[in-house]
């Protein structure tokens, strides 16, 4: 590959990759989220840093924000849409330091953000990753 003319993936590139990765996940797993919005930012904002008690903006790759399953099953409308925040710079740093494709990294972040929010075990999430 000619790296001389390559650039790091943009915010839009990562959003496109996130949509494709999400679409490749098993339908029963995707159904947990309902309609979802992907928000890609370079770094988490100050409120996320404070709320998550992070010392560095590179400590977090993504964040799920939405109603839990019990809230949705009760038919209660969530005040905000379900969103997954992906943090571009930390994701790119992780990608550069590991032997995984960028698509695999993004898919892993999506699975773990959704899975942790809905209480799935690490074994459950590993099984979902194995299916993709």
What are these regions (language model features)?
Residues 1-105, 117, 121-126, 132:
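Active-site rim/adjacent substrate-binding subdomains
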Residues 109, 113-117:
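Catalytic glutamate of the conserved HExxH
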């Amino acid at each position: 590959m000619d790296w001389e003319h390559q650039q790091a993936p943009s915010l839009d590139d990562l959003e496109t990759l996130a949509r494709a990765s999400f679409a490749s996940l098993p339908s029963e797993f995707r159904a947990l989220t309902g309609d979802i919005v992907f928000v890609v930012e370079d770094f988490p904002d100050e409120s996320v840093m404070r709320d998550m008690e992070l010392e560095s903006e590179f400590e977090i790759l993504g964040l799920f924000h939405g109603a839990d399953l019990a809230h949705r099953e009760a038919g209660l409308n969530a005040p905000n849409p379900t969103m997954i925040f992906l943090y571009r710079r930390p994701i790119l740093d992780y990608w550069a330091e590991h032997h995984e494709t960028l698509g695999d990294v993004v898919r892993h972040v999506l699975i773990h953000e959704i899975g942790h929010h809905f209480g799935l075990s690490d074994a459950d999430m590993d099984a979902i990753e194995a299916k993709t």
